[in-house]
Amino acid sequence: MAGGEAGVTLGQPHLSRQDLATLDVTKLTPLSHEIISRQATINIGTIGHVAHGKSTVVKAISGVHTVRFKNELERNITIKLGYANAKIYKLDDSSCPRPECYRSCGSSTPDEFPSDIPGIKGNFRLVRHVSFVDCPGHDILMATMLNGAAVMDAALLLIAGNESCPQPQTSEHLAAIEIMKLKHILILQNKIDLVKESQAKEQYEQILAFVQGTVAEGAPIIPISAQLKYNIEVVCEYIVKKIPVPLRDFTSEPRLIVIRSFDVNKPGCEVDDLKGGVAGGSILKGVLKVGQEIEVRPGIVSKDSEGKLMCKPIFSKIVSLFAEHNDLQYAAPGGLIGVGTKIDPTLCRADRMVGQVLGAVGALPEIFTELEISYFLLRRLLGVRTEGDKKAAKVQKLSKNEVLMVNIGSLSTGGRVSAVKADLGKIVLTNPVCTEVGEKIALSRRVEKHWRLIGWGQIRRGVTIKPTIDDE
């Protein structure tokens, strides 16, 4: 943060000021100007089969390339969840025809700029600030997506116009959206520049048939070309008109699920210049403020002399908050937020804190080591290509002592099934997790060397452990 008075943002002077002294959380909404000027308040997932153009669409709308890692660029696939924020603007001159009156820009663009359309005056004004969660498309990475989906308000389902619909992962992702109870979906028929008009129409019929009876039934289908940025402003218009602004809770104690964490210090840094670890995640509820005392659970996990699990929550203080390159004084629920802390950076490096929960001291949920869940299994394995007209493999029932992968919030951990009834199961977790009764979890099983989604469950109750807190 640039110097000056504490509690007032001074970085990016062209954006709206945030002042902690005058902050009244009861008056905030997901469209409050001082919030959307600097951070996203709506999360939209991009889902669909591999190489159907999910990352390209995000880049066309936000200008940010979500493929950040070298091995991802070379293989042209997204492995970690990518995030990109975009501001959506609407021209205030009503004589401008739709969809030209909508425009999208990166998150550090000023909140208002003059029209550059010939013959039309007026200003483009900021109406939404959205965050795209670019989900990996491969089925092994399905778990990553269910983790990311813990914080999605809507989804863009991408279908490539030059392949038949549906492709295996398209159906697997639709199933994941149903599990997540996402109601708001836009279907984008991409790569429209590569096919004849008749092919596009034929595929449009295929898409309609495919989504019938699913959550995506009745969703708008927009033909686009992400590479040529064709029809992108139509997507912006639909995001504004069709995706309702989610109801958010600004007044509860804040809680953030950590999806990324890193050490920002360069090697060879002087001791006095060391910065604390940074945790990145999406705030589920409440407002985090610079200077606030925080707690991270489960914290440091170890075993005592008898081999029993112990958790020692980490206590720290927020020294900075940011959304992409924008400094914040306070952060609200919505897009990905970076939280600069005073935590020992080695605890944060290379995503070590993923799956932890950060929030106000003493207000976080319990830490569980065993869960009792009510669960539902899918009838068939999703996304497996089957030879000829054989149906996809059936999902076998849960068996006692088998090991599953359990996804809770942003944590993926192993779990051994210790008891199982018709629709109730007990699972002993490999890693303790901070969660609460009623949370949804996803279950995956190893099938032919890959983790495949087999069902989901809801936490009924469980065995919790008391965190160890140093008596200082």
Swiss-Prot record:
Residues 48-55 are annotated as: G1. CDD domains: eIF2_gamma, eIF2_gamma_II, eIF2_gamma_III. InterPro entries: EFTu-like_2 (IPR004161), eIF2G (IPR050543), eIF2g_C (IPR015256), eIF2g_dom_2 (IPR044127), eIF2g_GTP-bd (IPR044128), P-loop_NTPase (IPR027417), T_Tr_GTP-bd_dom (IPR000795), Transl_B-barrel_sf (IPR009000). Its EC number is 3.6.5.3. The modification Phosphoserine is found at S16. Residues 39-247 form the tr-type G domain. Residues 225-227 are annotated as: G5. Residues 76-80 are annotated as: G2. Transmembrane segments: none annotated. Widely expressed in males. It is an enzyme of class 3 (hydrolase). Residues 134-137 are annotated as: G3. The keyword Cell division does not apply. The modification N-acetylalanine is found at A2. Residues 190-193 are annotated as: G4. It comes from the Eukaryota. It catalyses: GTP + H2O = GDP + phosphate + H(+). GO terms for biological process: formation of translation preinitiation complex; positive regulation of male gonad development; spermatogenesis. GO terms for molecular function: GTP binding; GTPase activity; translation initiation factor activity; tRNA binding. SUPFAM superfamilies: EF-Tu/eEF-1alpha/eIF2-gamma C-terminal domain (SSF50465), P-loop containing nucleoside triphosphate hydrolases (SSF52540), Translation proteins (SSF50447). Keywords: Acetylation, GTP-binding, Hydrolase, Initiation factor, Nucleotide-binding, Phosphoprotein, Protein biosynthesis. Has a homolog on chromosome X (Eif2s3x). Member of the eIF2 complex that functions in the early steps of protein synthesis by forming a ternary complex with GTP and initiator tRNA. This complex binds to a 40S ribosomal subunit, followed by mRNA binding to form the 43S pre-initiation complex (43S PIC). Junction of the 60S ribosomal subunit to form the 80S initiation complex is preceded by hydrolysis of the GTP bound to eIF2 and release of an eIF2-GDP binary complex. In order for eIF2 to recycle and catalyze another round of initiation, the GDP bound to eIF2 must exchange with GTP by way of a reaction catalyzed by eIF-2B. eIF2 is a heterotrimer composed of an alpha (EIF2S1), a beta (EIF2S2) and a gamma (Eif2s3x and Eif2s3y) chain. eIF2 is member of the 43S pre-initiation complex (43S PIC). NCBIfam families: PRK04000.1 (NF003077). This is Eukaryotic translation initiation factor 2 subunit 3, Y-linked. It comes from Rattus norvegicus. The gene is Eif2s3y.
